[in-house]
């Protein structure tokens, strides 16, 4: 309930993950198959799953380590909602050397039955957005698109451009209503979704966090299938 994991629980999760990896590779060796190269991220992901399961959490938020298609988090079978905030030319040796190729790897987390939110960083260039929207169509998923009311609010995005409008797709729009006037002061924003208007939300700099807040609000709504309790956003 809002507290970091204890050292004992973390150690238990790591031990359980390491043992699971050992058993899997023992079975592969017995079958004459090459053992998996279990990475540190693989171990941490499984350890997190163990900790979350034994703590009995209602919802766990997992972040892909790299891409999405072959990421360790893709082994989770109970994922109900996904979001992609945006993409960049990262890990090109593995994911591909174009934005479109990388988008394809990230879009692989969009699957039938999962709610989906596409952040402002997925909207441009249009060739990248097309990759995500095509995956949504193939999976039978209607995504929620995050949009900025003012282009100045996404000035820090890696691939600036004018986002297209898509009739029939729900949108979560956000606007910065108050900018920081001193070091350490928060910026304030509002987020408007098809379900509700959330005003006077706050986050710290850098400015792109406003887009991330909007994405998080839209994802929580999509996951729950309802508007959020206003008070909960300020806790």
Residue ranges and their predicted role:
Residues 103-111:
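Membrane-proximal helix-turn-helix segments that form the acceptor-binding/catalytic region
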Residues 110-121:
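Short loop-to-beta-strand entry elements in the cores of soluble alpha/beta enzymes
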Residues 98, 201-207:
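A short glycine-threonine-serine/GTX helix/turn-capping micro-motif
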Residues 181-182, 195, 205-207, 215-235:
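Gly/charged, well-structured mid-domain segments that form the phosphate/adenylate-handling core
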Residues 1-77, 89, 93-101, 123-127:
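ATP-dependent carboxylate-amine ligase catalytic core
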Residues 212:
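Short, conserved phosphate/pyrophosphate- and ester-handling motifs at nucleotide-, phospho-/glycolipid
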Residues 12, 16, 47, 51, ...:
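Alpha-helical scaffold segments in soluble metabolic enzymes
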Residues 47-94, 129-199:
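Extended acidic/charged loop-beta regions that coordinate divalent cations
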